[in-house]
């Protein structure tokens, strides 16, 4: 790529110096206080290996008194969140500082420090003051790190535009940290060149992410050029989400040349009229017809349907059946049915009754599975498990990808995996892990022991026995499909380690509506994970920040945790010694921050009770 991004600038806006509202405040003390607070949002001080909690400071000079860091400062995580103007990066091609606070908070730290400095001093050039309204990163390589999970993440930085207008689009009115400033294709290409120049696929090293909530990558006219350049860097599979509007034969043929490529096609309906109604697609035939072309060129894909209940729920379900059948006829790997979600920002009033729509959709999809060979999965899968299964976390197969090793060995819907190659399976997460090991390293015949209708059967599975649409580069778990990832028992082991180290009498574990039933079952079956002398309470915060019908725990914000804990403490007269929170709501950042870019450390600062994170992966499906 010409230039390889050397001239691309990652720049960020600074607001003008603030007017001091509280004249009685000691400006220099406030300056140091703010500088320390900024720093303590990105580091944890240590003495040797021991972490140190800092809540104040004192000067070495005449004023030797102790100054508190967080007293009377409101929501400490919101102290300087306005350092980037409106946060969206609008105007003059500035980046989104709210997004930087999420993905690379050292940039936000620089902005906050500069703003504090410019509140006190003017910078000069040639003897005169200089008005500073922004800054840019100097050496791109200085900002490279080992946080690039997969090459597909790089593509999302060229996804600020979309050519459709879906009624259920979650990008409308999203929070500042995930909001996109729509950019020209050439500007996106410049950023991609910079990112590719710093990308080391073997080391998993590259520039910090900043894609927020992406739109449609293939709408960028440089998309195929970008893919070709990325393919020179890595042989890894490209997973691309697309609305299908650009999937003509020429594009699909070029994607096949770049294999392995896997497409998640947001089709939503095989009916031209319904697709046009839901997505604003003036040429729905392109996306609908792309499924046959993908099959012809051997590009594996799945179909996504958001079950939006218009004009009625029954009509939406009938259309789902036709769409699933159409996907199966064209050898889709699977059909993913997303239970419709919305936030308070996008729909101030509920557009439908969630309990009715979600429950009826689950029942309908279970019936579809009995009639077709293509797996149909519900997202979030834990909802289906909670309303249809008494036993949670069972390694039950709900389908197999057509022509996959799992399908060709005779594995059937309803089978429960008991052992993989002689290794006993305790839960769903373990079954998936063992199947992944076989897929990555297996040769020749292996054995699956399954329970089917009360009988134990032994199946011989051959990892190499597969045809389209299953490919080892894009398929998972040898083609077996489950009710989601499952709960890892190791999470409870890490919780026990914390409880043993802390020895609280009363601990509060915060969970989610979806995970709590599985968590309670596992603790009931394994009570030794709670040490003697500790009483464990389980609470479920509501997502008041996003509102709507959002119940995924990983979408909770720091303020949701704070609000719930304060209410809970009021109900138990403050008798809690330790608060435990899964780390997954802060996973995306990599810096212990929620989706708004606020550090989880603010929870303890606000509620004045020790908070520990239980390290765990998100339970993505």
What are these regions (language model features)?
Residues 202-209, 285-379:
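Conserved C-terminal portion of the radical SAM core fold
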């Amino acid at each position: 790529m010409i230039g390889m991004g050397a001239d691309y600038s990652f720049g960020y806006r600074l607001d003008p110096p603030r007017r001091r509202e509280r004249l009685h405040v000691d400006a220099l003390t406030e300056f140091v206080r703010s500088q320390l607070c900024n720093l303590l949002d990105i580091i944890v001080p240590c003495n040797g290996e021991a972490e140190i909690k800092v809540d104040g400071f004192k000067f070495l000079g005449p004023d030797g008194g102790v100054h508190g860091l967080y007293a009377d400062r409101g929501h400490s995580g919101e102290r300087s969140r306005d350092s980037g103007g409106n946060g969206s990066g609008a105007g003059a091609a500035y980046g989104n500082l709210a997004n930087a606070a999420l993905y690379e908070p050292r940039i936000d730290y620089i902005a906050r420090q500069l703003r504090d400095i410019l509140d006190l001093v003017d910078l000069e050039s040639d003897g005169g003051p200089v008005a500073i309204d922004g800054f840019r990163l100097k050496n791109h390589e200085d900002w490279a790190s080992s946080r690039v999970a997969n090459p597909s993440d790089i593509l999302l930085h060229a996804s600020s535009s979309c050519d459709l207008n879906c009624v259920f689009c979650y990008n409308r009115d999203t929070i500042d940290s995930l909001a996109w400033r729509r950019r020209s294709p050439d500007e996106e290409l410049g950023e991609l060149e910079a990112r590719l120049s710093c990308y080391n696929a073997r080391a998993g090293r590259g520039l910090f992410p900043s894609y927020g909530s992406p739109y449609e990558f293939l709408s960028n006219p440089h998309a195929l050029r970008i893919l070709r350049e990325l393919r020179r860097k890595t042989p890894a599979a490209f997973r691309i989400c697309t609305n299908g509007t650009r999937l003509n034969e020429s594009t699909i043929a070029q994607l096949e040349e770049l294999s392995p490529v896997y497409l998640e096609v947001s089709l939503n309906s095989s009916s031209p009229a319904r697709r046009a109604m839901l997505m604003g697609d003036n040429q729905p035939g392109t996306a609908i017809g792309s499924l046959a072309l993908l099959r012809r060129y051997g590009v594996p894909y799945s179909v996504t349907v958001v079950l939006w209940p218009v004009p009625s729920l029954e009509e939406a379900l009938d259309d789902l059946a036709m769409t699933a059948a159409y996907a199966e006829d064209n050898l889709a790997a699977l059909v993913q049915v997303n239970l419709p979600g919305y936030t308070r920002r996008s729909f101030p009033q509920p557009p439908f009754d969630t309990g009715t729509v979600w429950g009826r959709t689950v029942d309908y999809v279970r019936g579809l599975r009995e009639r077709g060979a293509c797996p149909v999965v519900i997202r979030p899968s834990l909802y289906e498990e909670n309303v249809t299964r008494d036993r949670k976390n069972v390694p039950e197969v709900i389908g197999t990808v057509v022509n996959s090793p799992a399908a060709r060995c005779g594995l059937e819907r309803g089978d429960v995996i008991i052992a993989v190659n002689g290794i006993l399976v305790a839960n769903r997460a373990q079954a998936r892990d063992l199947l992944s090991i076989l897929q990555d390293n297996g040769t020749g015949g292996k054995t699956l022991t399954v329970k089917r209708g009360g009988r134990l059967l032994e199946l011989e599975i051959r990892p190499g026995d597969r045809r389209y649409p299953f490919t080892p580069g894009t398929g998972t778990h040898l083609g077996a499909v489950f009710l989601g990832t499952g709960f890892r028992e190791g999470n409870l082991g890490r919780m026990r380690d914390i409880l043993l180290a802390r020895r609280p009498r009363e601990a509060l574990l915060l969970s989610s509506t979806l995970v709590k039933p599985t968590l309670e079952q596992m603790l009931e079956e394994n009570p030794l994970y709670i040490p003697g002398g500790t009483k464990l309470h389980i609470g479920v915060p509501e997502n008041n920040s996003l509102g709507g019908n959002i119940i995924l725990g990983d979408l909770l914000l720091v303020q949701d945790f704070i609000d719930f804990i304060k209410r809970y403490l009021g109900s138990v007269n403050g008798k809690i010694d330790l608060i435990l929170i899964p780390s997954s709501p802060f996973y995306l950042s990599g810096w212990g921050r929620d989706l708004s870019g606020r550090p989880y450390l603010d929870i303890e600062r606000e509620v004045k009770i020790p908070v520990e994170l239980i390290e765990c992966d998100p339970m993505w499906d």
